[in-house]
Regions:
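Bacterial N-terminal signal peptides that target proteins for export
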Residues: 1-8
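N-terminal signal peptide c-region/cleavage motif recognized by signal peptidases
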Residues: 15-17
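Long, low-complexity, intrinsically disordered N-terminal extensions of eukaryotic proteins, enriched
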Residues: 3, 19-22
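Cysteine-centric segments in proteins
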Residues: 23-148
Length: 148
C-alpha cells in the first residue's frame, strides 16, 4: 500500500512537470506555445523527441510560419525554396529567417493522395529542421503534412 501511494505521488508530480515543455539551454526548439495559431489548410510538423504537439505550423500560402525557438513562438519568413512535393520520395528544401534565426528545412514525401481521389488534399512528409540562433544550433527530425 505504501509503495502504491509513493508511486501515485511520483506519477502526479512527474505528470505535472511534463505538461510544460520549453526550450532548454541545450535545445533551441520546443513545441509551439500556441498549438492553434494556424487552423485550416496548413503545414504542420511534430517531433515527439522534442515534446507533445506541433513544432512547426505554417499557412498553406506561406503567409505565416511559426516555430518555438529559444522559448518563444517565432514568426518565420520563407526566403527561398527549391524542389517539389508531388510524389513519394520528392524533396523540398526551404529556408526561413527571423531576427537572428535561420531555419533550413528539408522535406521528403512519404505519402500522397491516391490518384483519382479528388477529395484528398494532403501530402505527408518527414522533415529535418536545422535551426540556428546566434552560436546555438539544433537539428530536429519530425513528421508532418501539408494540405486541408
Amino acid at each position: 500500500m505504501r509503495l502504491i501511494k509513493c508511486s501515485a505521488v511520483v506519477i502526479v508530480l512527474f505528470g505535472a512537470t511534463s505538461l510544460v515543455w520549453s526550450a532548454t539551454p541545450d535545445h533551441l526548439v520546443a513545441p509551439l506555445k500556441d498549438q492553434h495559431a494556424i487552423d485550416g489548410c496548413a503545414w504542420s510538423a511534430s517531433a515527439p523527441t522534442v515534446g507533445p504537439g506541433f513544432v512547426f505550423l505554417g499557412e498553406i500560402d506561406d503567409s505565416r510560419s511559426l516555430m518555438n525557438i529559444g522559448g518563444s513562438d517565432v514568426d518565420l519568413a520563407l526566403t527561398s525554396q527549391h524542389g517539389t512535393l508531388k510524389k513519394v520520395g520528392d524533396v523540398l528544401e526551404r529556408t526561413f529567417k527571423a531576427h537572428g534565426v535561420l531555419v533550413n528545412a528539408k522535406y521528403r514525401v512519404t505519402w500522397t493522395c491516391p490518384k483519382g481521389d479528388d477529395s484528398c488534399e494532403v501530402t505527408r512528409f518527414t522533415v529535418s529542421f536545422n535551426v540556428s540562433k546566434g552560436s546555438k544550433q539544433q537539428t530536429v527530425r519530425a513528421t508532418g503534412d501539408v494540405g486541408c
